Each structure stands twice: as C-alpha cells, then as structure tokens.
Amino acid sequence: MILLAKFRNLYSKSRANDTISEGDKPEKATGDLEAGRNRLVSMEVGMGNDEVVSSGSGNSAHGRSISPSPSSASHGDPLLPVAENWCHTQVKVVKFNYMWTINNFSFCREEMGEVLKSSTFSAGCNDKLKWCLRINPKGLDEESRDYLSLYLLLVQCNKSEVRAKFKFSILNAKREETKAMESQRAYRFVQGKDWGFKKFIRRDFLLDEANGLLPGDRLSIFCEVSVVAETVNVTGQTNVSQLFKVPPCRLADDMYGLFDNKQFSDFTLVCKSDLGSPTQTFHIHKAILAARSRVFSAMFEHHMQESDTNMTTVDDIEPEVMRELLVYMYTGQTKYIEQMAQSLIAAADKYQLDRLKVMCEQALCYQLTTDNASLTLMLADMYSASQLRAHSINFINVNANEVMDTEGWEDLVRDHPKLLEEVFRALATQQTPPVVLVQPPKKRPKHNCPY
C-alpha cells in the first residue's frame, strides 16, 4: 500500500508537469494595422537582427525540451532526448542601406502635406524591388505641422507583398548617426505603399544650428532596410553517435593574447615618435610577422642588421599606429581604423599589407567631405590606392563647386598638376554627351531602268 501511494503521488506530479499553464499558451498572431501611418504592422513570424533568422521546429512539449539538431543537443545529459529527424526553417533577410542628401534644406518652400522624394534605390543590380524615401518638410497634416515627416515607399514590386523593417537617422557634421528611429516589427509593404514616422523630428530642433544637424544647410538622411527574401526549410537526421558540440573559434583572441603578453617573443621593435609621444617597445614574433608581411620576411631572411641583432627601430610611424598595425598582423582585425585611416594606409603601404590598405581606402571613402576630398585624392595618389583615387575623383566631380572653394583644392592646383589634369579630364568626360557616329547611307543598287 505504501508503494502504491508513492506511485500515485509520482503519477499526479507527472500529470501536473504535463499541463501547459495559461501563460505558456501561444499568443494569436496579430493582423495588419492599416489605419494610420504611425501604427506598427505586426508580423506572424518575428524577425531578429541576424542576416539569417532560424526557427527550429522542435517546440517545448509536456514539460520536456526536445533537441532538434546536433548543434543544440547535450551529449552528456540523459534528460534531454535527441530528435532523430529535424527541420530548420531559415527566414533569409537581405539588408541594405541608402543615404539621401538634401542641399539648401532651409530653402524648402513646400507647404504642409507637400512631398519631396529621393531617387529610387534597391538592394542590388538584380533586385526587382525599388524603393525611395519621401519627406514632408512641414509635416503631413495639421497634427504634424511642426515636424518633419519621413517615410519609406515601395515604388516597384514583383510580388504581392513584401515584409520589411527599416531604420532612419540623421548624419550630423561628424557623419555620426543621430535621432535614429526604427520600426520594432516588420511592416507589410505593397507596391505604392509607404510606412514611416509622421513626427520624425521637430522642425525647430532640426533648423537650430546649435544642434549641428544641418552642416552647410545640408540634410543627410541615412536609411537601413531589412527585407524578408525567402523562407527555406532544411531537414535532416541526427546520428546520435556523432554528437559533438564544437566551441567557437578563438584564434584571433589567442593571437592577441600572444602579442599582448610577450610570451615566446624573439624580436624587439622600438617605435619612436616625431610628435612627442613616448617611445614604445614591442616584443614580437618573427615567424608571425614574416608570414604576414613580405617586407618583414625579407628583413629576417637576409643577413641584415635587424636580423642579426633581433631588433629594429621605426621612427616614421607613430607608436599608437604601429601598435594597431601589429594587432592587425596578429589577429586580422583592427578596432581604430576609422580614427587612424590616414596613418594606417601609409603603414600598410610600407609593409605591403594589401588587405589592410584596402580596408583603409574604404574607411577614407566613407569619410569623404568637400573639405577633405582634395587631400584624400593626394593621399590616394601618394600610396597608389587606386580604388580610393577613383572614388575621390568621382566625389570631386559631383561636388566640384564646393570642393574648388577649399584650401585643399589650392594645394592640389599648386603641387599636383597631373592630378588636376586627371580630375578635369574626368569632369569633361562626365559632362560631354556621348558622340553618336552617323554611318553614310548605303549606295542604291543599280537597276536597268530608263527612269
């Protein structure tokens, strides 16, 4: 009887665990809210921040966790059974961004409700979805007349509908994102439909020079869009005997630790500053530097003074730049490339670090302004940075009037006549309409006709 009572007690507890509480019941999916521009559209499938959002098909049932695949199973825990068959649903998301610049924004004379539109844009050349931004500089209606209204519009679509999230922000004088607003869920777009914020930012705050949102009376709106591209099911079977949880790769962290704690170092690099910064000494590893840089490889391979003494002195690179360069050589990563791009591109060119050099070119392209465009072009020419050079010339051509009023342009005219010639040649090519060659008419065939 005692054993029977214990069995009944255990059975009743098991049944209690199998019952799903009211708080555990799934919520119903909310339908689309079409009533107002500022109301959110809820989505039946919740979206995350990753490029590909996966949703495993194994749900919690009767109080037990089911492992849908080897990646989430625990090999040593007998309480977590492993599903022999599983499915992953991958919601693929395409992310892209767009910047819209409006010059002389304070002169916009549009009345309340009137619209300015950007040119159309898409995620890529083969993307059939066309988007544009539109603003109401003086608000959409009476309620928002003191605000700037901002929307994302689906101009062209080859589907019945598209789900997308978006984020708007304004770039200040330092090209930093400010006043960002984003949708918390994916919106349902159809062709000709827009979603956005009726009260994006107050006009008086935007126009106040002290806030620095209109440098040179130029409004720069940055938009990031995430579009649901497709949903793919991936199915498979689990081989229980091969369940291994592989830890993430820590190679970059381990290599940084090797650089930082000087363990097993066999070479000393002394870096002196021309700007008064303290001299720094780096204890490094010849094998790593030789593998990463052809310059260091040649230095260590031949019987040079540096190779014999296992020490070298560098006085043409600042110590903090040299440290960032060495961190990149050990880990393949760099934290401060945006702040050090001009100095790092010189160091990367000196030590023939081609990938780092292109990374610096990209960072400098993002930092292009009318004030520094000429200097950036001269920098690109000095270090044979072809991509940065082409981008700088194109930027100067697009903003020629503003660039020609800067001191950097005067330096370019005075010291770099060949570069100046290249800029004018590109400008002339851009402005001259293409020449259409007209072929002479073909001769008529001769006929034996008296007329």
UniProtKB/Swiss-Prot annotation:
<feature type="domain" description="BTB">
    <location>
        <begin position="265"/>
        <end position="338"/>
    </location>
</feature>
<dbReference type="InterPro" id="IPR011333">
    <property type="entry name" value="SKP1/BTB/POZ_sf"/>
</dbReference>
<dbReference type="InterPro" id="IPR000210">
    <property type="entry name" value="BTB/POZ_dom"/>
</dbReference>
<dbReference type="GO" id="GO:0031625">
    <property type="term" value="F:ubiquitin protein ligase binding"/>
</dbReference>
<dbReference type="InterPro" id="IPR056423">
    <property type="entry name" value="BACK_BPM_SPOP"/>
</dbReference>
<dbReference type="GO" id="GO:0016567">
    <property type="term" value="P:protein ubiquitination"/>
</dbReference>
<feature type="region of interest" description="Disordered">
    <location>
        <begin position="51"/>
        <end position="75"/>
    </location>
</feature>
<keyword id="KW-0539">Nucleus</keyword>
<dbReference type="GO" id="GO:0043161">
    <property type="term" value="P:proteasome-mediated ubiquitin-dependent protein catabolic process"/>
</dbReference>
<comment type="function">
    <text>Mediates ubiquitination and proteasomal degradation of target proteins, most likely in complex with cul-3. May promote the degradation of bromodomain-containing proteins such as bet-1.</text>
</comment>
<dbReference type="Pfam" id="PF00651">
    <property type="entry name" value="BTB"/>
</dbReference>
<dbReference type="GO" id="GO:0005737">
    <property type="term" value="C:cytoplasm"/>
</dbReference>
<dbReference type="GO" id="GO:0016607">
    <property type="term" value="C:nuclear speck"/>
</dbReference>
<keyword id="KW-0833">Ubl conjugation pathway</keyword>
<dbReference type="Pfam" id="PF22486">
    <property type="entry name" value="MATH_2"/>
</dbReference>
<comment type="pathway">
    <text>Protein modification; protein ubiquitination.</text>
</comment>
<protein>
    <recommendedName>
        <fullName>Speckle-type POZ protein homolog</fullName>
    </recommendedName>
</protein>
<dbReference type="InterPro" id="IPR008974">
    <property type="entry name" value="TRAF-like"/>
</dbReference>
<feature type="compositionally biased region" description="Low complexity">
    <location>
        <begin position="60"/>
        <end position="75"/>
    </location>
</feature>
<dbReference type="Pfam" id="PF24570">
    <property type="entry name" value="BACK_BPM_SPOP"/>
</dbReference>
<comment type="similarity">
    <text>Belongs to the Tdpoz family.</text>
</comment>
<dbReference type="InterPro" id="IPR002083">
    <property type="entry name" value="MATH/TRAF_dom"/>
</dbReference>
<feature type="domain" description="MATH">
    <location>
        <begin position="95"/>
        <end position="225"/>
    </location>
</feature>
<dbReference type="GO" id="GO:0005634">
    <property type="term" value="C:nucleus"/>
</dbReference>
<dbReference type="GO" id="GO:0030162">
    <property type="term" value="P:regulation of proteolysis"/>
</dbReference>
